[in-house]
Amino acid sequence: MSEGEKKEKKERRLSLYAKILIAVGCVWAVFFALSFSKSFDDWYVNNIFPLIQGVVARIFNIFPFAAGEIIMYLGAVTLIVTIIWSVVFGIFKLVRRIRRKSAKKSRIYRTYMKVILVIAVCFLWMYLFHWWIPYNGHVMGEPAAEERRGYTIEEYRYVWRLISVKFRDSQKAVPRDENGRIIYPDKKTAYEAVIRSMKNLSERYPRLKGYYGTPKAAKCSDVLDWMGIGGYTYPYTMEITYNKYTSDLYWYVLIAHETAHYKGFYKENEGEFMGMLAAVLSDDPIMVYAGCEDSYYFLSAALMNALVDQYGMKEGLQIFRQFMQEDAELMPDEDLAYRDEMDAYEAAEEAYAADSHPLEQYSDTAAEAADVGWDTQEAVSAENYYDDGTRLFMDYFMGEKAKGTK
């Protein structure tokens, strides 16, 4: 084969590479445009997403560690290497031009950049189909969930009383040792309780059907702890990870929250709502206790805010205290709840203290970065932020009341 034929064949090969990228880019652009239709997004999550999630989650569940976390680290290193190499290569070419020397072509650099481009396209593809389209749909996949109706004081009080009773009863039902401390099961048993509850809710929310992989403790749990992050679901590998220093009591609500993301409910209000709902409706007494503790204080705050808005600070607080007195027999033992919560946090702190943390000197920097991240997430999420989970919780129980069920 002559030199000219080799060159022509090489050009054809490059042309094929470009054509494939262009074709993939066009398909991506079409679905990106479709993603701005919430009806399409809901259809996609209900019909296509479960197939993708089932396959991808099964593949990465094979690994005993969080592959998504490792990929994230490799991605960060690759980005740094790419930036440094590109800057050095650019300076080198500029110097040769200034000296009026022909710039040498780097086959290695060009090949590397082609690979990087393919990787970038793959990630854009996965984030579009694994996260962006599900995230853009209606809240809970239901247009009605976005109506955001207001609730009266009486309605808040109804749900508050309902959860108070569950909270009180679950305090008595949880297994305790001779010192009155809660006896927690291992993570496998606890997660089985989470899965059962999520699957029980699948009649109401069909997206919760299907395959559930095993949550994995994050290697960077200490960093997550400094940043105030309990867990993260990796969209590209469909893996649930959690901060291993999370308290055993809160762990149930956290994993239910992350599992909701795992099933396509990616908005934070959806995750917050599903975390509380799955917990309070669980058949596991510790999980019920965890969910009631979480939702009880959110509902108390919502009820108090409604009273203050209507009657002013002083009178509103007086009425709230009056409600507490009138419903005293329905109320949980808040001192016991506080002790249980502190016991769980102390155990988590002991686990943290038992491990080495070589990056601990950067904990303040991580916390500052987290503050920026939380503020940014709140601005982007807007009305779909965590605090809207209480409104969805109210929607559910008021809907159940209207149907004559609890």
Regions found by a protein language model. Give the residues of each.
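Pan-zinc metallopeptidase signature
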Residues: 329-406
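Membrane-interface segments at or immediately adjacent to transmembrane helices
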Residues: 132-203
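Auxiliary, metal-adjacent structural segments of Zn-dependent hydrolase domains
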Residues: 175-240, 244, 248
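Internal/C-terminal transmembrane anchor helices
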Residues: 104-135
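Membrane-interfacial, low-structure loops and terminal tails that flank and connect transmembrane helices
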Residues: 1-13, 89-110
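Active-site recognition of the HExxH zinc-binding catalytic motif
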Residues: 64, 253-272, 276-277
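Post-HExxH zinc-binding segment in Zn-dependent metallohydrolases
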Residues: 156-158, 163, 266-313
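Membrane-embedded alpha-helical segments of integral membrane proteins
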Residues: 26-92
